[in-house]
Amino acid sequence: DMQEAVVAHAKKLELKGAALIKKYNCNSNPLMLGLYQLLAEGRAARNWGMMAKCIKDPFIANRYAKIAKDETFHATIGRMELEKLCETQEAQDEINAVINDFRRDLHAINSAKTGELPEARELMAAYA
């Protein structure tokens, strides 16, 4: 049953970048929300954009491109908010304290769905 599968998938937050909203307290911390938007939504924008370029069906490719545009908009909001909020050393320190863990968590979520490429593993080692 397709509807049942959709509902079951929607409940698996550990497989989605949105799980980081809770982990990093993004709903009550504007700095963390900006970080989430910039990194997670930015990653989503790149992924949807890449899929839009690879899909042969023009209808689906167009839909994916629209999703990529929306995700880019959210990432831009995050970047703008961080630029505004990170004017103090305290705010910068708060971001710097979590950013590498955030990247690793986002990478783990992506890898759980698609597998991990050796190149991605090397890139993530830079954040150790």
Each language-model region and where it sits:
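Non-heme di-metal
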Residues: 1-128
